[in-house]
Amino acid sequence: MVEPRATYRVQLHPGFTFDDAANLAEYFAELGISHLYCSPYLQATPGSTHGYDVVDHRRINEDLGGAAGHARMHSALREYGLGQVLDLVPNHMAIVSPYNPWWWDVLENGPASNYASYFDVDWETPEKRLRNSVLIPVLGDQYGVVLESGEIVLERDGAVLTVRYHEHRFPVAPRSLDTILSAAALRCGSDELAFLADTFGRLPLPTATDLESTRRRHRDKDVLRTFLTRLLREHREVGPALDAVISEINQRRDALHLLLERQNYRLAYWRAASHDLGYRRFFDINTLVGMRMEDEYVFADTHFLVLRWLADGTLDGVRVDHIDGLRDPEQYLRRLHQAQPEAWIVVEKILEPGEALRASWPIAGTTGYDFLNTVNGLLIDPAAERPLTRFYTEFTGEPADFTRVALEKKDLVMREILGSDLNRLTALFLEVCERHPRHRDYTRHELHEAICAAVAHLPVYRTYLREAAAAGEAEESARGPEHVNPDDQRLIDAAIEGAKAARSDIDQRLFDFLRDLLLLRLHGTFEVELAMRFQQLTGPVMAKAVEDTAFYCFNRFVALNEVGGDPARFGVGAVEFHRECETAQAHWPLRMLTTSTHDTKRSDDLRARLCLLSEIPDRWIAAVRGWSEMNRPWWRGGLSDHNAEYLFYQTLVGAWPLERERILDYMRKAAREAKLHTSWTAPNEEYERSLAGFVEGALDNAEFIADLKTFVAPLVWPGRVNALAQTLIKLTAPGVPDFYQGGELWNVTLVDPDNRRPVDYALRRRLLSEMRCATVEQVLARADEGLPKLWLIRQALDLRRRQPQLFGRDGDYNPLRARGTHAAHAIAFSRGGDAISIAPRLPLTLGGDWADTTMALPSGRWRNEMTGDIVDGGEIALAKLLARFPVALLSREERAS
């Protein structure tokens, strides 16, 4: 295994395949990247643009080039000394039929499927109508309406019968073939077909899940299907008879309904998913079903290829997607680690301010959202919080209390978006209460509301109590389930006390009982199940409510509205930044460091410019007042939304120049995500037309655009200075720097799909080549092309390549402090004793004049990797160090004798 020095993330899809990545291996190597970091590439839904919708863990995605293309990419990477890191998706699979063979088997055989236990499905739901079947919410209207319209049809392909609804296909349960085959046998006079009909009808019920019954069921149905295939081939009258019966069923809606009632699934109106779904999803995406990764055989079957690649060196590491969705994240990570102890494992884990990554997890660290928000906070002047807060409330009429907004959106998401998950948990809570006489009189409504309140008041994504130690974890086994991490105790106490305060109308003893359950003080099967499921629900609620809703409602200062961020946390000081870096070096020296990803709400360079507004709040407020007056006529039809308008102005300032279609698409998406006036599930066409009309009117307003350009112009270079500062910090802070595709040049993009547009690699290759002989002055002269950022990345990665010991697990971290008038505007630290990073912060108020500010360099001769200048240790003016390039990376060439 090779520890990554720097990773480069690519989004693989049919338009950018293994061969496209292979062709860039030389470029990545020249840039200084050590590992290509790939989006998921196991077999996904055909045409997938992202790969997170895996349908088959045993195959490589054919859309990307399949096994042959994968081998070519691996060979090309190896030729240039590059390793590979893969994004893993253990939490869920796509269930788009018929592409997922395991799910197809589940729909065909119900609880008796060999794969029924692979998926997080509630077969024993309290509702009789849904018991032992899977709700499939794909219909565009009520089931009966769709059935009568003839949109659901029975079809045959050889001996295989399927149900089709537009592009959706579903299997027909083997036992339910009896009536179809029997009718066809009568029609064509076939005794053999009649025999098959009787035999299909005598297959074990799908609810017979004992080993003998399931074995007989699967053996017999396969044999019977083979006989049916032979019969269709050898007796030409059978096929037409079968087709005639199928045609009759399609014409007789009652007959088709009776057939559908015998299936192991229940076709339903898509809106039913919000409250009646019987399986755990990835967030609210009905086609992504949760996996029971806690079961060892599920882990083994889903990780066969990945573990082989880790063993043979094809992969050096993995990124684990949505770790909080798993029932037992620590167990999962230990299995990965035990399979390949040297593998570099990072997890997509959102840490709330003050929350620490679990030290017991055998990983390198997170994927870097915590780092992203810390660095972002460095670029923000906290003094602007009061004026910006006051103006936001004045201009929009919206409350400036983000905690309140987040709580409201959690409640909204639980009730309207994740209602199915909440209802399943409520039903389980009711079952638990029935087993405890002191609590059995609580109503379903009370239990529902208590869970809602507790989930809403949990201050983090989730807790990590474990129901039992994984096999082989002797120390954990000895401690038993009674052991509760103090962090979990504190968090659950906070959730319960917050819930009590918010819902004084609910019997407080119910909350105390819920606390005992969540802390595993009651050890029954149902009691433990409740605690485990609660933990799996809180993460999706937080993500959907905060990241995907509140972040689009609370627009006070959107530079703070980033994945893993807290909009109420206005800025990060140098002391806090250094403390977090020291902690990282001590505990997570190989964590991933990122500033942009495929999931960020705004790219790093866009945020870097937006952060400048915190340095000029008065100018910004005056500008917005003027712009609002200029654009007042474009709000028509009596509709206006000043919160959306404020988001619009911030977005334009951060991303200007911005194509019309991009801002229109973004504003529509932001409005739907906010769920205030319109949403994805209930689009408000009148509101959306009004919003689009306002945006179009503003963009066509020559006076406004001229004033916008005048405002933005003096922010362009300081914004780039901020971008270079955060890039240098990422390149040299404790951890492994990651670069999102295309981000080696200025990267000004909005949330997906805007940040997943094609990257011009021909341009990047050309610029990298042209830089080989360039001076730093020539690089800066071509700043509009992005050369300063490309230069910084190449130079810093080259130093990491030459002296890896300075930056890895053994490279210590020491804060450095400037002296003088503008000392607070410098952020500096040393790595491994022989490398020093120096970057400016708050460049607008600095004004480019460092005055008497100095930095004390350790003794010896130091080379500035950005400029080639040599300086001697001792007190040196920052004006001199940063005269030729906005940031400095010094490497010690020799120590003092």
Residue spans for each PLM region:
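Carbohydrate-interacting/catalytic domains
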Residues: 1-46, 58, 63, 71, ...
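Aromatic- and acidic-residue-enriched segments that line the glycan-binding/catalytic groove
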Residues: 48-56, 92-122, 360-369, 756
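Conserved, well-structured beta-alpha core segment at the onset of a catalytic domain
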Residues: 67-85, 93, 97, 104
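Active-site region of glycoside hydrolase catalytic domains
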Residues: 96-172
